[in-house]
Structure formats: structure tokens, C-alpha cells
């Protein structure tokens, strides 16, 4: 792992950032990682991990100070996601989803909305981002959830699926179509639904291949009433807000995938240094060394690209959608390659739950699917080269 230790050492962190990362490292080593196998086996929401994250104030690092936060750089946030995901992928995505759901409110919400809704998240509340429906996955314009104005309220009817944190969230950022707008793209709007809103119901939780400690809910909105003041922006602003928010959440998913990949790479190389066949360590076979060289190089390139992208975002860049797609696609692809080889290098042991690589392989797959499938990202990247 010398090359990755060197990359980490070369990252320039302020004293405050380094102090926080040291605290995160202790948190993951002492609390989050030791809980990971139990959480996965039980399929239990990791409340202890969430409470530990809250004690450290990690939600506050992406919330502006005016609303109870203690903001730090996007690059630092990604480093935190990477560390938590390396220790426990379920906890990593629970934490990252808070950012995914609240960033649109931070960027596009009114002063009144941010003052009213953000402090709960900064102090440790949970958030969810509700976009996907049975008929609307990669194509968000197919969503059928409807927002009907009624005086000083908006009445919501519809359903969402695959919503991370959906059953436990204090705030749900919900996308739907505003009544009275015929164009399916221009009708998309977004509002905040608060926990306990009348007409909001959790229909059930998915039983998943991986990320078993992270709850994935199906939600129904049956005449659900929320204040009209919870609408972010104007009716019809939702698609622009959605696309802008995805450009921020995709680097977050890349960091999450890199965390999983790092855990698998560490376990694989440690095992290969110990395991012997035909009197030799399996790491001493040339074919295995070639495989490690390819994986290590690709993982390092994914990390460096993500660092580059985070630097652009921290510098105020606004147009980085293609770079974000590249980061998410490449990081999730290399994560799946690494976990596959890690299981292979462990032989039969890798297929057994006594070894972490079994869980990591299950956890890695979804990173190629959520926040836009990698097929969609390849299309977005390739299409960007077409002349108009």
C-alpha cells in the first residue's frame, strides 16, 4: 500500500482538516469497522454508527455556518466519505445521502427554507433524496408523482422506490411534477417533506444483495400535505436542480466506491503476502503481480481524478458534469474489478462470510447502478464529443 500511503501523504490538508481526518480514522477503527460484519449479517440500521458520526459533527461539514454548520472543503467531505465507506459501506452511504439530499436545498433554497430546515441536519438529522419510481429510473421525466397546490399547502400523490434513508429521514427532498404544467420536463419540481407529514407512508424495505445496514424504502404519498413554502425554487425548476445536484452527488459516489475498493485491495494484498502455494507466496507469482499492478494503477488514477474534480469544485467551477460522470463511472468500475479479484485471490475462503471480501463484493455492485447507471454515464461522456 506504499503508493496509496504516499498519495495520502502528499495531499495538502490544513491543520484543522488533518485533525478532523485523524478523528475520523479513530472513529472508523474503533466503532464503525468493528460493527460492519454484524450490521451486514443482521441487516440492521447502524444507529450506533450514526450517533458516533453525529458526536463528531460530520454532518456540519457540508452545511453553511449560518444554518448551524461548520463548513469545510468538498475535497475534505469526499475524504470522509471514502474513510467511512472503507470501514462500512452501509454507514458510508447513509452519511453520503445526507449530503446528496440537502445540497439542493443549500444551493437553491430560500433563506427562510434554509433557516427552518437545515439546522436539524447540521446537528445530526437524517435526509433522503426521493427521485426514482417504478416507471422513472434513468429517465426522470417519466415520474408520475404529482404536486397539486391547495391554498398555502401542496398536496402530494404518488410513490417512490429505492429511497436510501427513506424510512428514517427527518427531511426528504422529493421530486415530482407540478400540476398545470403539461411539458414533462418543465413540470418537474422539488420540495421538502418533513418527517411525520400526514399522508406519508413507508410501504416496505428492500432486501438487498449488499449495503444491508442501509435501509432502502418504498414510499407512498397519499394526499400528503406539506406547506407550499417547502417548494424549492419555482414550479418547473426541478429538472435543473436535479441535474445540478447529481453533478455533486456523483463524485460522492465515486469516493464511496473508492473506499470499498481500498478495503478490498488491502485485504487482497495482505492475504497474498501470507498465503503460500507450491512453496511460494501467491504474491510472488508473476501473473498475480501483473494483476496487482493494473488494479493499483487504475485505483490510483481514480483517486487522482477525484482529487482533481474536487479541487475544481472547491475553486467554484460550475460546469463539471462530464468530469463527474467520469469519476463515478471509473471509480465504480475499478471497485468491482478489485473486489472480484480479491475474492478470486482468497479462493474458496473469499466466498465465505468469515472474510470481509465476500461482503465487499456484494457492496460494490450497486455503485455501478445508483446515481445513474454506468451505461448512462458512458452515453453522457460519449455524447459530449458529438458536434452540434
Where are the regions that the model predicts?
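A short, Trp-centered hydrophobic/proline-enriched beta-strand micro-motif
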Residues: 123-132
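N-terminal glycine-rich flavin-associated loop
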Residues: 89-112, 137-140, 148, 153
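Short Ser/Thr-interspersed hydrophobic loop/turn segments at strand-loop and sheet-helix junctions
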Residues: 57, 81-85, 193-198, 222-225
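A short core secondary-structure module
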Residues: 153, 157-202
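A short, charged helix-loop
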Residues: 217-244
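Flexible, small-/acidic-enriched active-site or ligand-binding loops
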Residues: 142-144, 196-227
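Short Gly/Pro-enriched turn/cap motifs at secondary-structure boundaries
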Residues: 135-138, 162-165, 181-182, 208-215
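Alpha-helical interface subdomain recognition
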Residues: 1-87, 91, 108-111, 124, ...
Amino acid at each position: 500500500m506504499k503508493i496509496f500511503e504516499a498519495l495520502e501523504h502528499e495531499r495538502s490538508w490544513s491543520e484543522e482538516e488533518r485533525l478532523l481526518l485523524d478523528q475520523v480514522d479513530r472513529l472508523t477503527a474503533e466503532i464503525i469497522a468493528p460493527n460492519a460484519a454484524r450490521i451486514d449479517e443482521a441487516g440492521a440500521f447502524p444507529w450506533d454508527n450514526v450517533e458516533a458520526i453525529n458526536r463528531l459533527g460530520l454532518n456540519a461539514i457540508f452545511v453553511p455556518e449560518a444554518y448551524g454548520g461548520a463548513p469545510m472543503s468538498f475535497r475534505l467531505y469526499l475524504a470522509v466519505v471514502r474513510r467511512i465507506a472503507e470501514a462500512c459501506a452501509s454507514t458510508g452511504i447513509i452519511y453520503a445521502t445526507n449530503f446528496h439530499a440537502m445540497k439542493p436545498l443549500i444551493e437553491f433554497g430560500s433563506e427562510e427554507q434554509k433557516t427552518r430546515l437545515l439546522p436539524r441536519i447540521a446537528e445530526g438529522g437524517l435526509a433522503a433524496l426521493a427521485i426514482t419510481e417504478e416507471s422513472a429510473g434513468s429517465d426522470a421525466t417519466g415520474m408520475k408523482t404529482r404536486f397539486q397546490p391547495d391554498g398555502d399547502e401542496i398536496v402530494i400523490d404518488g410513490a417512490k422506490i429505492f429511497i436510501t434513508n427513506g424510512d428514517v429521514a427527518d427531511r426528504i427532498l422529493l421530486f415530482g411534477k407540478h400540476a398545470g404544467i403539461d411539458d414533462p420536463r418543465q413540470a418537474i419540481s422539488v420540495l421538502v417533506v418533513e418527517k411525520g407529514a400526514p399522508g406519508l407512508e413507508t410501504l416496505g424495505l428492500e432486501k438487498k444483495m449488499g449495503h444491508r445496514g442501509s435501509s432502502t424504502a418504498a414510499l407512498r404519498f397519499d394526499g400528503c400535505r406539506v406547506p407550499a413554502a417547502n417548494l424549492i425554487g419555482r414550479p418547473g425548476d426541478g429538472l435543473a436542480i436535479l441535474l445540478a445536484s447529481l453533478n455533486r452527488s456523483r463524485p460522492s459516489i465515486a469516493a464511496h466506491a473508492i473506499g470499498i475498493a481500498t478495503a478490498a485491495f488491502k485485504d487482497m494484498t495482505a492475504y497474498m503476502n501470507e498465503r503460500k502455494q507450491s512453496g511460494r507466496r501467491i504474491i510472488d507469482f508473476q501473473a498475480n503481480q501483473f494483476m496487482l499492478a493494473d488494479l493499483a494503477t487504475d485505483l490510483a488514477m481514480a483517486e487522482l481524478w477525484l482529487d482533481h474534480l474536487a479541487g475544481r469544485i472547491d475553486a467554484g467551477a460550475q460546469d463539471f458534469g462530464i468530469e463527474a460522470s467520469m469519476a463515478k463511472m471509473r471509480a465504480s468500475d475499478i471497485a468491482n474489478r478489485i473486489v472480484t479479484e480479491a475474492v478470486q485471490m482468497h479462493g474458496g475462503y473469499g466466498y465465505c462470510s468469515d472474510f470481509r471480501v465476500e461482503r465487499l463484493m456484494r457492496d460494490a455492485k450497486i455503485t455501478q447502478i445508483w446515481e445513474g447507471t454506468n451505461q448512462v454515464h458512458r452515453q453522457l461522456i460519449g455524447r459530449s464529443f458529438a458536434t452540434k
